[in-house]
Structure formats: structure tokens, C-alpha cells
């Protein structure tokens, strides 16, 4: 029978059906080709919003820079970046007045973090612009390369392992007249193979040194590499995002630590919390406004949208904020926090790969690298690209564009939230000094504004005042995209509120299914996702049971592990049937070995191995979990693992799942083709780091591992630890005198070698 889909919604309030309108099923759109065009759009737009500012030239790099601060205020609704310094400082002062001691306390907390943070903090994060190779690399490799170059140039403060000392090296490197960099490259040559007598291509990896003068080095240190943001749903056009290099990252981290500490103390801030905690925080603000709007007042909520938040923010404003927030703090602390905004006001945007041309008639393809855009003849380009290039040309230096105004996406989320909250804070009656007042929520560029007033005219006046206050701080509320409703129904960061938050289940859809890590992890992640959605997202028992059955089916098709008694033929069915026939207790077989599924919605929290352990044949247990079995993963597996889930919007989330090491928790080997490329040297470096870290962990098992706060190298830490352990073992009689003497001797030898080095 055909079901009329509208029947599904008869009993559902419209807000709960919001899920069905979200573009979250199916594959998200990905970008192909180069991001050069999108980056040029960003650079040109940013300059357009600040065009009535003052032009200056950077004395070191010669880059032209536009400064819109304290510029003319816009006449009408056009977005603009002309923030007024005195207004920003006043907003900060009022924020401090209504939260006594907030800045002071956050500074004290941050100072502690600054002194204790290790440089390995910078290894977190995905792709990072590696200035030594002028392209993107994994964060850990980019950091390693930076430190290697610093050391070969005699910058050695970083050896203490503290982030703040690494940053001292960064500062000093900018004063150097030249920096010598080692790059990996590969040579190809044709040689005759002795055995087969055929000609083969031999690749050798070379390292070559070259010197960067001060100007080139500064340009690289201030460069943000750009890429296209992938997998953005619900948008027709792609957009560019930026990844900064290692010189900037450490400074940004400290600024964001301070801002995060402030946000934690602000009830209107949607950061840094997430999930249910965020919902509770937001519900509080709404409750406050509803209870305070007595019978005499009416209350309205704006679901807000800001026009081009990042492109109208300005690093110079952030510098003013930091100067105010840290006003009574020690000089060194103020300096270290002011460097990030200063670097950002001198930033350069790398234009990416350039343009690809192809001639249909001659079947030729050629790449025009970004470096050539400054002086190539424009007749080859279509009109829109021509306009872009003409506009950006005055800003180009060595394939990067000078981009002083604006912030790139996601760099100062916390600090910009503080700026937004400072405007919400001005809505208290003691500041508005009239009958209307406002409050709201802010999370990076997203906001919800709740206005209370005795009548409609008051609401309108309140909204207008909020709008104009925002303009003074370089924030542009979009009149087209923001909408107003009676308080009780609004949307904020994709949470829909209707007398309480309704579950937006569609956002979780992409996380369902088989993740593709390995058989063991996938089973665990799959059931954990279902469990989490029952807890957090109104996934009902019947739907959860169905989701579970679909997941098991999906899992069996993915790993070709249908039940041993099935008729389905796959490549694995021969082996699985054999195992099925020789197993006494068939219920004990894992699903991935052709066993039955014992999961139901009551036992989703138990790892499959534990669920079936008592039901397993003894020899099966032995094969499955025997540490001597070469197929059991030998990584000391933590009892809790992290999977990276890609929710429908927002950053990738870490999701914890239970992990039991079995023959099914294999880790796939690296693709061999990397070994023949110029990346090989980098790979060897990575393996060396891996070995060092593993060795270090042997000395400091996680149970006793305290971050060393003192200043010592890894080697020193391990040697001193070895001595302590040896002494304890010797005194308790666990080791003999000869062994003890030998350990001490080895420790001394290591120290001697280290000194000679």
C-alpha cells in the first residue's frame, strides 16, 4: 500500500520535523582542482569591505597594507570593517565592570598554562603550512622541520621543550639577516639493470641547502596557506580556508587559551562547551529573559546572521582587546600575547596551486602557478577571472597576496566570541538607560538576540541600537538573513529551540554506518553511535532497534562476513563456513567471523568480545586474544579509543568507544608508493620520532606519566628515570649488584655521548 508521507507529520510539531529539511543524507560536495579562485575572492572581498581605510607599506616585506580601523562609518547597510578603537575598549571596560575580576583571573590562569605548555602541543592538528618546504604537511612533520631548521641556524632555546622557548626562537629568527633551509628533492636517472638488462628509472633522494634572506623568510613566516573547504553542505559555492605555519600557531594558541578562559566565565558564550552542556547554558539565558519579561513586557528573539564575520574582523582590534585585557599584567606576558594579532595584521595569503589550462584542439594541459599571475597576459582568462586578477595584482608578492585586514576562518574563534558577547552585555538596563533591554547568545559568528520591551516600538528601537552598536565594533548583522520571532522559537548553531531544544536528528545521519577503521573498531563505533543517539538525540527504542539491524547488515556486507549458515556466497564464505562447522558454541563467534548478532538496545555499551566471551570455545578464545598471535595488534591498546566522527556541520568530533585488542583490530600498512618519492626522507623522520616516543613511553608508563614541568630533554628525563628505577629495584633486592652497576654505567655513557655531540 502507498503511504501518504504527510500522515507521518500529523502528530509532529513543525519544529520537530526540521530534520527532514536538512541536506545531510548522501555524500557531501567536495571541491576539485585548485582553490586559487576562492582565495582571490576572499582577498578581494576583504579589501572591498575596508576600502575606505588607509594604505601603508610594510617596511620589511614591502607589502601594501590596508588599515580600516577608525575609518568612516558606513552610510547604510553595506558590510564594513571600520571598527572604532574607543568603542571596542569601552565595550571591554563594561564587560569587566559587570564581571568583576574576569580578565585578571583569566590572565592568571593563562600565565600558568603558558609556562607549562610543551612544544608538542603544536603537533595537534591536521594539515599545516610547512614554510621550510613551502607546502602543506601533517602538523608533527611541519613542527619537526621547523625545529630542525632553527637548530641548524643556531636557534636552540627550543631544546628545553617548552612552547614559550620555541616562540623565543621564532622571535629571534625574524631578526636574522638570513635563514638556511634544507629541502628534500629527488633526482631521476635512467640506468641499466644488471639482472634484467632493461633500462630502469632510479630515484635518489637529495637534500639541498639554500638561504632565505630576511624578506623571503618573513614572507614565509607570515604566510597562511589556503585550501578549499570540503564537504560543506547546503552551499552552492565553495570557499577558501587557511592553514597558518608553525611560527604563528604557538602565539595563536596562547591568545585562544586566554580567550577560552574568558568565554568559560561568560554565560552568553556558546564556546568552548558543546552538546548537552551548551544546550543547558543557552536554555538558562532564555529562561532568564522569559521570567524577567513580566506581564508588562513583550519579548522577541532574533535568529541572527552576520555578513562575512571573518572578513570584517580586524587583527588590530584584537590587539586593542588584548592590550586592555592584560593591562596590569607583567610585560613579558603582554608581549607574547600581542604577537599573534601583530603577525595577523601583516599576514600574506598563499594563492594555492594556480590555474589549470587546457587546449581542446591540441589536447594540452598546463598549470599556471600562482607566482606567474602577477605578470601573465590576461587574454587567456575569462572575464570574471580577469577582474579578480586585476584587482589582486597590486597586492601580490612572490605568489602570495598581502592581506592585512580580516581574519581567516577559524583562527580566533574564542576571542571574536568575547567581542560579540561584549555587545550582548551592553543590553542590560543600566547600560541602555531606557525601557528596552537585551541579552543573547554568541558562538563565534553565530548569535541569537533576545530583546524585551514594553511595546513593539521599544523592541524595534532595541534592535536598531544593537545593530548600530555592532557596526561600531566591525560586526555586520545581516538584515536580510536575520529573522525575528516571539521568544520561545529560534535557532542557534543549528540547535532549534521551541520551549526547549528539539533534537535535530538529521545532523547525526552521516555518523551512522560502517566507519572503515577495522572489523573490531567498526563494530564498536557503530553500536556506540546508536547508543549516543538514544541518549542525546531522541532516537526512540523502535528506531534504534531498526538502526541496529541495518548496521549489522551493512557491517556484514562491508566485511563479507555473513553468518556461517547463510546461502550468500562471498570470497570469505568458504573460510567462514569451515570455522562455523568446527565451532561447538556457534553463538560465541564474533559477527566478523560469521557469528550471530547478540546486540540489542539494552547491551550496546558492552564490547562484542566481552558480550560473547563466556559463549566462546576455548581454542577460539585463545586464537582471538592471544598476545603471541602475530595478528593481534601489539600496540598497547587503551581501554578507550577515539574515533574521529564527521558530524554534518562543525568540526570533526572525537568519539570515544571501547576497544578490546583482538585479531580483528589490525592496523593497515602504509602505502608503499610513498617510499619512492621525495616524501621518503620525511617518512624516515616520522619513523624516528615514532621510535623515540615509544621508547619514552616505556620509561614513563601512562599510569605514572606526569608532564615534566621542569626543563629537561627527553634523554635527560629517561636517564634520570632509569637511575631512580634501578636504585629502587636494587635496594628492594629485585636486581643484582652487577646489573645495577651495569645500568649506572650505561647511563653515564649516554650522558657522555650527549655532551660530545
Swiss-Prot record:
GO terms for biological process: DNA-templated transcription; symbiont-mediated suppression of host gene expression; symbiont-mediated suppression of host mRNA transcription via inhibition of RNA polymerase II activity; viral RNA genome replication; viral transcription. Residues 53-82 are annotated as: Disordered. It catalyses: RNA(n) + a ribonucleoside 5'-triphosphate = RNA(n+1) + diphosphate. Its main location: host cell. GO terms for molecular function: nucleotide binding; RNA binding; RNA-directed RNA polymerase activity. InterPro entries: RNA-dir_pol_NSvirus (IPR007099), RNA_pol_PB1_influenza (IPR001407). Residues 249-256 are annotated as: Promoter-binding site. Influenza RNA polymerase is composed of three subunits: PB1, PB2 and PA. Interacts (via N-terminus) with PA (via C-terminus). Interacts (via C-terminus) with PB2 (via N-terminus); this interaction is essential for transcription initiation. Interacts (via C-terminus) with human PKP2 (via N-terminus); the interaction competitively inhibits the interaction between the RNA polymerase subunits PB1 and PB2. Belongs to the influenza viruses polymerase PB1 family. This is RNA-directed RNA polymerase catalytic subunit. The lineage of its organism: Viruses, Riboviria, Orthornavirae, Negarnaviricota, Polyploviricotina.
